[in-house]
């Protein structure tokens, strides 16, 4: 992962609790903006600022607020839990480019604002895959790795023939450019909190409806015609 620069900004992302709440869920104790790689990323913390750090990456199409149940429990056990909204997610800025490498650079930029000491890496789904790659790229920055249903990177395997890697890259780039053209003027359809929760439930029917209605006001914005998820419509899993 290339070296990055980060600058913590003085104002802070919103951490007001939604209404109604959800049993066991708690909004972060602190929040801040991190200027990283040309983007403003929203970072959040639960727990004692002097406690040992768990660095937490959320899943694809999620945001740091989806840790509002897990992080408080870890914080109450003495940990300092730190997460952030990935580029194009939650309160972080949208970007002209999304890639696995860009996510790694952003993660390292946020980590650099926390501590130089090794910490625990924790990631869920795509975030688990991201933390796997981070552990390989910067092994001196972690003590332990917790992978919750993590996905592997979509980078080409090193033992593939060069012509196969080239063909894969051509196919991926073509599909990505076609996708960008299709969504150039796209806008996420508005809805009520219940409607957005129902859409998210289709991605994972096991999730409690009340929990989904709790996270909508955290990861979405209310407009005159209804609520819309803050996630950039141009996003695709794995960057490309």
Predicted regions and their residues:
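Alpha/beta-hydrolase fold catalytic core
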Residues: 1-54, 76-79, 116-117, 152-153
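Short, hydrophobic alpha-helix immediately C-terminal to the catalytic nucleophile
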Residues: 68, 108, 132-136
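Alpha/beta-hydrolase
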Residues: 187-240
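Conserved HGGG/HGGXW glycine-rich cap/lid loop of the alpha/beta-hydrolase fold
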Residues: 42-93
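Active-site loop/oxyanion-hole signature of alpha/beta-hydrolase fold enzymes
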Residues: 34-39, 76, 86-122, 126, ...
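Conserved hydrolase catalytic core segment
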Residues: 117-163
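A catalytic-pocket lid/entrance helix-loop region that shapes and gates access to the active site
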Residues: 148-188
């Amino acid at each position: 992962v290339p070296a990055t620069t980060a600058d913590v900004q003085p104002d802070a992302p919103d951490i007001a609790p939604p209404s109604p709440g959800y049993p066991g869920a708690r909004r972060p104790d602190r929040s801040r903006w991190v200027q990283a790689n040309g983007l403003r990323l929203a970072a959040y913390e639960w727990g004692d600022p002097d406690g040992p750090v768990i660095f937490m990456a959320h899943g694809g199409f999620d945001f740091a607020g989806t840790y509002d149940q897990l992080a408080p429990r870890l914080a109450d056990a003495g940990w300092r839990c730190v997460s952030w909204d990935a580029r194009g997610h939650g309160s972080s800025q949208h970007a002209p480019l999304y890639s696995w490498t860009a996510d790694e650079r952003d993660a390292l930029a946020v980590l650099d604002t926390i501590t130089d000491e090794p910490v625990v890496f924790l990631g869920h789904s795509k975030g688990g895959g991201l933390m796997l790659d981070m552990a390989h790229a910067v092994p001196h920055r972690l003590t332990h790795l917790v992978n919750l249903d993590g996905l592997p990177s979509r980078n080409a395997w090193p033992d593939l023939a060069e012509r196969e890697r080239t063909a894969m890259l051509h196919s991926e780039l073509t599909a990505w450019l076609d996708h960008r053209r299709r969504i150039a003027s796209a806008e996420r359809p508005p809805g009520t909190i219940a409607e957005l929760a129902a859409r998210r439930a289709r991605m994972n029917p096991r999730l409690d409806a009340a929990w989904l209605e709790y996270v909508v006001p955290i990861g979405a914005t209310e407009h005159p015609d209804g609520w819309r998820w803050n996630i950039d419509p141009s996003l695709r899993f794995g960057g490309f």
